[in-house]
Each structure stands twice: as structure tokens, then as C-alpha cells.
Regions:
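Non-catalytic, conformational "gating/processing" segments within enzyme and secreted inhibitor domains
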Residues: 172, 203-236, 428-429, 445, ...
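Active-site His/Glu-centered metal-binding helix of metallohydrolases
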Residues: 76-84, 292, 531-532, 741
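Histidine-acidic residue clusters that define the catalytic metal-binding segment
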Residues: 30-37, 132, 158, 176-216, ...
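Short, conserved secondary-structure transition motifs
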Residues: 156-162, 252-266, 369-378, 571, ...
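Proteolytic maturation boundary segments
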Residues: 14, 29-45, 225-264, 270-272, ...
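Bacterial N-terminal signal peptides
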Residues: 12-24
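M16 family metallopeptidases and their MPP-like homologs
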Residues: 46-48, 53-79, 93-138, 167-193, ...
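Bacterial N-terminal signal peptides that target proteins for export
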Residues: 2-15
Length: 892
């Protein structure tokens, strides 16, 4: 569960806020059928058909959030969101967890100021199950005192987790400073003291008051028959009675005041922000503010220009909208040795010029062109499209996402300049800075997995499911994939894979060059790949950085060059988009002056990074898993970066960038013949230079046990990783029984063994999961969780006991059935977005797997036995050799 926020920089990045809201429909709405209805009880229903994959995403949106929390209890809405997963009359928490795990998709929720959303993504054949759950939860919730006592521990772990994030701490300070005395002074998270004082009757009252059909909007998106789906919704929801709604709290904004805020961060770079209060979502000025944000965030604008000038490492502008107000802010990142005050002066000067003289008109047109492309691209993800529709209608109060694009199309340059003059109010801006501070080197950690305290583990008994869910669990079958990719090889050795899709008028190109800097960089040249990557953003031999960005804006394209490269365009611009991508990828400018700026900045960043707790945690883990001479332990230093020349970068580029190690995947409204013609036209003349380099890491010996604690003064909670290395490759047949067993341990929601024992039954952690990682030559097994320092060893002991249990006894039939159902359902879910389709096809090529590998995997999972899983865990897992690495306070 989460509280959703909008923005860039220290908040989740949103590339063009308006695009994310207006991107469900193109200019011609009839290409995406939409069915709307309002039931007699007031429930608004929107069903959008999208046939990208046999998948459905549902979003139940209650028009209530933290704004309506009782005074002194800012996390009430968030707490009730958690308790919605603790059961309802007729549906226990155990049943809900089991069903959520079986379905395999996103089963989550988020709470915002004026909205609480419940999200579920399932195979299309299981849409009835998702709708049953949401109808049951709308009717009522258990909200028992015993459940709240347990859930309180988990939600307080979430609070601790966020408070361990310096970015969140700065965000909280910013909200308090800009919105003092209003509900906006706090976000939806809540506080530990308020949760300690919260009683279950308060939560039940909150649900009874606000969780009514006449205060909700249900959005269903995916491969469904809209009319048949609406009838299912009527049957399940129509009898839920409407209720009178309480009066809503008013937000009385006082005058804005300038302030300066600061926090320390464990990150290797600092962040300087300049934030201004602006109108909220429902203001008539909001569309112009969206366009202004896009203009100020453009890499052609002066704010980003601080980066190539060497004055900042990164720079952008963002909008964090709330219902009745919002925050617009510039955010720039800087190295540890740079002066944030000087950056603040630079940013103020740039924004002051905009307020006085306005924005470049060509950037307004470019912003609109990018919005049009992003609008069409939103149809390329079923879950994303559901989110876009839900936000547009429930949060922004629009009739459809298309309405926002229509508003943006009407915005003029004069409108943008007017809102810039009015709202870029630097005299009342809040300046905020995160200053990088190292917390020290790793130290040996005691405790390990022993200790005297013994924790009694409960049994992970599966519970009987309702009749409407039981059939879904028992259905284990291989559904034919909706994908039929075609693979071919160009004469120069480049592999081309084409997957036609027609859900949108777009084409996406994904590329990957097989590479390993750890083995391909020359001795003493560590960091050369890190210099090359940003250097590729400076255009091509024909078009310098600004000219290249302008060419992309002309067609509304999004492009990135590197060993992983891509371009996203409207179908009509496919040829031009590939031409620009190839020009950048094969003929990069690599200007010497940019090389100087990047090397100087990177050397400072690397120096700070190798002292940062996050980096020390990762390096400590690698050092514990692999021998001292392993290539993965090579690291860039300030000295190695400063010693690099442009010739070193060019030499690395020529050695690594070659067609016979490259795979390109094209997905979208394009035929295989057209794709081959255009890819061949622009990439066909590319030739390899010399012999293929070695791109594989060596097989590693088994690691020894150990425990390392990395101090991090900025955290109040520990991040914990338990790990061991594996001599397992992705193509090894044992990958599948290990993956199935990992699903039993930690693969889905909180009906897994680890989550039941570490979160649900004991409240020791907020979240826990297990991950099987396998590459071309080696693998690893991880268990990761976050908890208070006094719980680190207790939680680790549970994890080790569960690993032993997987080896000592066969998985129960119900557990195995649920894990199989989960993995089988994840197959169609992985095909529900164009990005996932493209990257998954590249991965299969990278690991020498057949393109229809998911079909093979499904048959393996169906036939697999509990004995197969037990044998694989006995063969590969070594609980006594687990390494424990913690980041945060001293673990106990």
C-alpha cells in the first residue's frame, strides 16, 4: 500500500504531468470504446476496452483521503486502507491474501489527500473474482481490534521506512512549511504517535461514513466485453445501499512565506529545490501550469542548460498538484563539493527571467507535440490506462483523460506567460536542500542468524476459498500467448524481433547490446562506461545536443542511446524516429568539451558515491558473495575517471558497440516487412570492429557465511538483505522448480510463508520478499526486508527456518497449487504493456531462451511436483552460508 505523490526529482518522476492524466484516448475517441453508467445507488462505472493482452485492471476510487482525517490523526485514511486487506464479512484476511496471491497481478492500494484507490490487475478470465472482492469490501469491513493491533505494527514499519528516506523527510518539511494550519500540512502517511492513539472504532466509523457507492467510481480497463462486464457489476454492486456523506473539511490557505529547509542524505549527490505554491487541480489556470511545467522541464530550456555548463548534475521542473493548491518546484542535483547556494542563485535568475520575459514559444509547441505522443502511448499498458482514467475522473474531476489534452491544446503562449508571471513568486519561495553526508565504512556485524530467542512459527495453512474464487484457483492451464514475434538476422549480424500490435497508433523500438563493463573495460579504465553513457546525450555528428532535441520534439519522440537504447514515436513518424536513433547510436557527437564536464562531475560523484551507505551496502554484498579478484568487484574511482581520455572512451565505444551483439525489438503498429526495411535502412551498414569481446562473468565459487552492517545515520529502520550465490544459469532446468519454490516463500502479497510469519503474525517487518536471480553464467538468491534494528536478527531467524523447512519437507498441496496459479497468471500479465513485451523479448534473446519461453515455462509449472521443488532447494540453497548485509542503525 502507498500514498501516491506527483513530481520529479526527490518524488516519483512523472515525465510530463499532463500526459499521464490525458493519455487514455486519442483525438478520435471511437477507437477506444468506453461504456459509462451510474447505478441507482450512485456508483459511477467506466469500462474501457483494450485488447493488448487477455488482462483486466480494476480501480475502485473512493472520493476520500487524508483531507477528511480527524484532527490529530492524519493517517486515518491510510490506516483504513490497510485494514481493507484484513477482511470483510464473508471474506477473511486469509482468503483475501490467498486470492490476491493466486491472481498474480498488482493487488494494492494508495491513499492521497482526496482519494483512496484499490487496484487489482488480473487475467481477463478472472475479472469476476476481482469484482467480487471489491463489492464485498464496499459492503463492509471487519476492522477488528485484534487485526488492528497486528496491522499497526506493519503500518508503523511503513512510516519508519519512509522516514528513513531523506527525500521523504524533506518533502514532509516542505508540506509543513507551505501549508501550515491546513490538512495539506501532512501527507497521507500518518505518524507513529497518531497510530498508537488510533482505536479501531475510529477506523470503522471512517469506513461507514465514506466507503459508500455514491462516493465511489469503479474503472475497469482491459480485454472485456463492456456490456457484459457492466451487467456483472450491476449484479454485485447494485444492492449496496447509498449513504448520506458527511461535510468535507475546508482548506483555508494562509499567506505563503519564504523559508529555507535542509536535511542530510546518504546519497552521493545533493539536491537543491526551489518550491512555490500554485493553484490546485480544479483551478482554470491548471492547464497552463501543466504546459509551463513541461516547458521548464525541457532539456532545451535554460534550467537543464545548467547540466552541460557543468553547474549541475541534473535539473528539471515539476508540479505536485493537490485538490485546492499545489507545489511547483525546480530541482537540481549537485556533487558533494559544489555549493548549493550558488545553484539557488542560478535557478532564481532563470525563473525570474521567465516571469519577466516569458517562455520560448517554440517550447510551448514542443510541449504540446510531446503531449500528443504521450497521450497515444498511454494505451500501451492496460494497468497504466486504468490508472490514467481513474486519476482523470476521480482526482482531476474530468469527464475523461481526453479532456485534459483538449484543455492543453487550447493553452496559448500568452496563457503560459501569464501564469509564469503570477505564480513564479520567488519572494515567497521555499528553498530546500539535501546535503550528501557519508555515514562511515561497513563494519562486521554480530548476531548473525543465531541468538537465544526462539520464535514459534505458525503454520501457513491455506484456507477454504469462497465458491466464486475456488474455480479460479483450480484452473491450471496454458493459455495461448497473444504474442507471435518474428525473429530474423540482418547481414551484419544484428538480431531483429518484430511484434505487431494495434492497440495504439504507435511504434516502440527497444535495443540492447550484450556487454559487461566489468570484463570489457581495460585495466585502469574503470568508469569508462559511466562517462560514455551521458556523453551519448550530446547529439550526433550531424546534430548537436540542442538541434537533436529539437528534431525529437518536431515529431514528439522520446529517445535514448546507449548499450540499452530506445525510441518511442507515433506510427507515422517511425522512419524518422529510427533515423534519429541510429544517428545518435552509430554516429554520436562525443564532443570534447562535454567530455571535460562529464569527467569532472563524475569524478566528484564517484568519490561521494563510494563513501555513501547505499553503495557500501551493494559493494559489501558483492564482496561477501564473490572472491576478491572477481570482475564484479572492479570499481571506478575519482582517479580512474579523471585519468580517462576521449580516446579511451572512443576505444571502448568501438569495442562494445557492434551489431553482432545487438538485438532490436520493434513493437507496435508496423508490419514485419516494414520494420525490417526501416531497421535495415538505418542500422544495416553498421559493421563490427574486430573479434567479439568476452561479455560473460566467470563462474564463482560458493560464498562463505558472514554478516556486515553498513552504518547509515539518515535511516531509522534497517534495510536487510540475506543472500547466497548460485552456480545457476537462466537456461538451467532447475531454474523453474526454484522459481516455483520462491513463489511459495515470498512471491505474492502476504499469503506467502515469509510474509505470514515476518509481517502478518509478528509485525516484525512491513514488507518482505524473495528473489531468484539467474544470468548467463551465475545466479543468486535473495531475501530482503526492512525493519526496526531490534528486529533484524529475529526476522532473519524466521527466514532461515523457512528455508530449512523448504528443504526438510515437501510443500503442501494447497501451497503448491497456489504458487502454480500465481506463476501461470503472471504470464499473460507480463504481456499487458508494450514496454514489458519489448524488454522481455530482449531478455529471452540475451539468455538464449526461445521467444515462446513463457509457454514452455507454463507447461513445466503445471507438471511440477512438490518433490521437484524440494529436490531443487536441497541441491541449490545453502541456508548456513547466507550472508546478511544491513544498512541503517546497528542491528540487533
Amino acid at each position: 500500500m502507498s500514498r501516491s505523490r506527483r513530481g520529479r526529482g526527490i518524488w516519483p518522476t512523472l515525465a510530463g504531468l499532463a500526459a499521464s492524466l490525458c493519455a487514455a484516448l486519442p483525438a478520435h475517441a471511437d477507437t477506444a470504446p468506453v461504456l459509462r453508467a451510474t447505478l441507482d445507488n450512485g456508483l459511477r462505472v467506466i469500462v474501457v476496452r483494450n485488447t493488448l493482452a487477455p488482462v483486466v485492471a480494476t480501480s475502485v476510487n473512493y472520493l476520500v483521503g487524508s483531507d477528511e482525517a480527524p484532527p490529530g490523526f492524519p493517517g486515518t485514511a491510510h490506516a483504513q486502507e490497510h485494514m481493507m486487506f484484513r477482511g470483510s464479512p464473508g471474506l477473511s484476511a486469509e482468503q483475501l491474501a490467498d486470492i490476491g496471491s493466486i491472481m498474480g497481478g498488482n493487488f494494492n492500494a494508495n491513499t492521497r489527500e482526496s482519494l483512496t484507490q484499490y487496484l487489482f490487475t488480473v487475467p481477463a478470465e478472472d475479472v469476476d473474482v476481482a469484482l467480487h472482492i471489491e463489492a464485498t469490501r464496499m459492503r463492509g469491513v471487519l476492522d477488528s481490534a485484534a487485526d488492528w493491533d497486528q496491522e499497526r505494527g506493519a503500518i508503523e514499519q511503513e512510516v519508519a521506512q519512509d522516514l528513513s528516506n531523506p527525500g521523504y523527510k524533506l518533502y514532509a518539511q516542505l508540506r509543513a512549511a507551505m501549508f501550515a494550519g491546513t490538512p495539506y500540512a501532512h501527507d497521507a502517511l500518518g505518524t507513529r504517535p497518531s497510530f498508537d492513539a488510533t482505536r479501531v472504532n475510529m477506523l470503522r466509523q471512517f469506513h461507514d461514513a465514506w466507503y459508500a457507492p455514491n462516493n465511489a467510481i469503479l474503472v475497469v480497463v482491459g480485454d472485456v466485453d463492456p456490456n457484459a462486464t457492466l451487467e456483472k457489476i450491476r449484479a454485485l454492486f447494485a444492492s449496496i445501499p447509498a449513504r448520506p456523506l458527511p461535510a468535507r473539511h475546508l482548506v483555508h490557505l494562509g499567506p505563503a512565506h519564504a523559508a529555507h529547509l535542509s536535511v542530510d542524505t546518504d546519497r552521493p549527490t545533493g539536491t537543491q529545490m526551489l518550491a512555490m505554491r500554485v493553484p490546485g487541480l480544479h483551478s482554470p489556470d491548471f492547464p497552463a501550469l501543466e504546459v509551463l511545467t513541461d516547458v521548464l522541464a525541457s532539456e532545451r530550456f535554460d534550467l537543464y542548460g545548467l547540466v552541460p555548463q557543468g553547474k549541475a548534475i541534473g535539473a528539471t521542473f515539476a508540479l505536485d498538484p493537490l485538490p485546492q493548491a499545489g507545489v511547483a518546484y525546480a530541482v537540481v542535483s549537485f556533487s558533494k563539493d559544489e555549493d548549493p547556494k550558488a545553484l539557488d542563485v542560478e535557478v532564481r535568475s532563470i525563473l525570474a527571467r521567465v516571469a519577466r520575459h516569458g517562455v520560448p514559444p517554440e517550447l510551448v509547441q514542443a510541449a504540446k507535440q510531446q503531449e500528443r505522443r504521450q497521450t497515444e502511448f498511454q494505451k500501451n499498458s492496460i494497468e497504466g490506462l486504468a490508472s490514467v482514467w481513474a486519476d482523470a475522473v476521480a482526482l482531476y474531476g474530468l469527464d475523461s483523460p481526453e479532456e485534459d489534452l483538449q484543455r492543453i491544446e487550447k493553452v496559448t503562449v500568452a496563457d503560459v506567460n501569464r501564469v509564469a508571471r503570477r505564480y513564479l513568486d520567488l519572494a515567497h519561495a521555499v528553498s530546500a536542500v539535501m546535503t550528501p553526508q557519508g555515514s562511515g565504512r561497513p563494519v562486521a556485524s554480530g548476531g548473525g542468524f543465531g541468538g537465544q530467542e526462539s520464535i514459534s512459527l505458525g503454520e501457513a495453512h491455506a484456507t477454504a476459498l469462497p465458491e466464486w474464487a475456488r474455480a479460479a484457483l483450480e484452473r491450471l492451464e496454458v493459455k495461448p500467448s497473444s504474442l507471435h514475434p518474428l525473429m530474423s538476422t540482418l547481414p551484419n549480424g544484428l538480431t531483429l524481433i518484430v511484434q505487431p500490435e494495434d492497440v495504439s497508433d504507435t511504434v516502440s523500438v527497444f535495443g540492447h547490446i550484450r556487454n559487461r563493463p566489468e570484463v570489457e573495460a581495460g585495466a585502469g579504465k574503470e568508469g569508462v562506461n559511466q562517462v560514455l553513457e551521458p556523453l551519448l546525450a550530446y547529439g550526433s555528428e550531424k546534430l548537436d545536443r540542442l538541434a537533436f532535441e529539437s528534431a525529437l520534439d518536431d515529431i514528439g519522440a522520446d529517445e535514448h542511446a546507449g548499450t540499452d537504447f530506445d525510441v518511442q514515436v507515433l506510427a507515422q513518424n517511425f522512419d524518422r524516429g529510427v533515423a534519429l536513433l541510429a544517428d545518435n547510436e552509430l554516429h554520436p557527437a562525443l564532443p570534447p568539451e562535454a567530455m571535460s564536464v562529464i569527467s569532472n562531475q563524475l569524478s566528484q560523484v564517484v568519490g561521494a558515491r563510494i563513501r555513501s551507505p547505499g553503495y557500501q551496502t551493494q559493494r559489501s554484498l558483492r564482496a561477501a558473495l564473490f572472491p576478491p579478484d572477481d570482475p564484479s568487484l572492479r570499481e571506478a574511482t575519482p582517479e580512474s575517471v579523471r585519468a580517462l581520455s576521449l580516446d579511451d572512451v572512443l576505444s571502448y565505444y568501438r569495442r562494445v558497440f557492434r551489431p553482432d551483439l545487438t538485438t532490436i525489438v520493434v513493437v507496435g503498429r508496423v508490419s514485419p516487412e516494414q520494420a525490417r526495411e526501416i531497421i535495415g535502412k538505418y542500422f544495416g551498414a553498421w559493421q563490427a570492429d574486430g573479434q567479439k569481446p568476452d561479455t560473460d562473468l566467470p563462474i564463482a565459487p560458493a560464498n562463505k557465511p558472514g554478516a556486515v552492517a553498513v552504518p547509515d545515520a539518515s535511516r531509522v529502520q534497517d534495510i536487510v538483505v540475506l543472500a547466497q550465490n548460485l552456480a545457476l544459469t537462466r537456461s538451467d532446468p532447475d531454474y523453474y522448480p526454484l522459481e516455483l519454490g520462491s513463489a511459495v516463500l515470498g512471491g505474492g502479497f502476504y499469503s506467502t510463508r515469509l510474509s505470514i510469519e515476518m509481517r502478518k503474525n509478528t509485525g516484525l517487518v512491513y514488507s518482505v520478499g524473495s528473489t531468484l536471480q539467474a544470468g548467463r553464467t551465475r545466479g543468486a538468491y535473495y531475501i530482503q526486508y526492512a525493519c526496526d534494528p531490534q528486529n533484524v536478527s529475529k526476522a532473519a531467524q524466521i527466514a532461515v527456518q523457512e528455508l530449512h523447512s523448504m528443504q526438510d519437507s515437501a510443500v503442501g498441496g494447497d501451497e503448491l497449487l497456489r504458487a502454480k496459479a500465481l506463476l501461470l497468471r503472471q504470464i499473460p500479465l507480463s504481456e499487458a504493456s508494450v514496454d514489458e513485451i519489448g524488454h522481455d523479448l530482449i531478455d529471452r534473446r540475451e539468455y538464449d531462451l526461445p521467444l515462446d519461453e513463457p509457454d514452455h515455462a507454463a507447461r513445466r509449472y503445471i507438471d511440477m511436483t512438490a518433490a521437484d521443488v524440494q529436490a531443487a532447494f536441497r541441491k541449490w540453497l545453502r541456508p548456513a552460508d547466507l550472508v546478511r548485509v544491513t544498512q541503517g542503525p546497528t542491528p540487533q
